[in-house]
Amino acid sequence: LWEYNINFTIQREIPDNHYFYYTTLYPIHPDYQKRLATYRPFGSPIDSPAGIQGKATQFVMILDALQLRLLEKIRSDLAGYSVVRSTSPLDNRAIWLEIFAGGIHKGNSCQTLLKKLNINCKEVAGLGNDYNDIDFLDICAEAYLVANAPVNLQRHYKLVKSDKEEGFTEFISKVL
């Protein structure tokens, strides 16, 4: 990850995944700075792979507008991993790339749960709000997005009101 010139965090292994390593080798994105400040007690700085001890559950990269053009290159370079785009929960604007072991995403998690519960995907409705919900929504028989989801996702799914305007309530009334 060092070769992309993007700072990142490495979440430690469960149950200690609230602890993380982080880099500050490149100009720091304001959202990244806020994340580090918010969770400072749990973070340890590193400046090379040698600083990493133990296993990891997730990498998080926060991209600025220029770095966003690297998204497909990173996905291609890390083809054996799940590289999931999401919007920052901190500023609701910054683009995060979350990198997990291959096959780890909301869609597979949902399928695993449905299988254990003996429920067919054709019986499932889902509501999402961001890019990290795509894998989950794509397995649902009825897939909805809240109206304040990213515009370029909205043409792919049915829409309900925004999460600020009782979109969840509208979703429930449509699927029940």
What feature does the model see in each segment?
Residues 4-7, 11-125, 134:
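Conserved acidic, metal-coordinating active-site core of Asp-based
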Residues 97-176:
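Mg2+-dependent phosphoryl-transfer enzymes with acidic/Ser/Thr/Gly-rich catalytic loops
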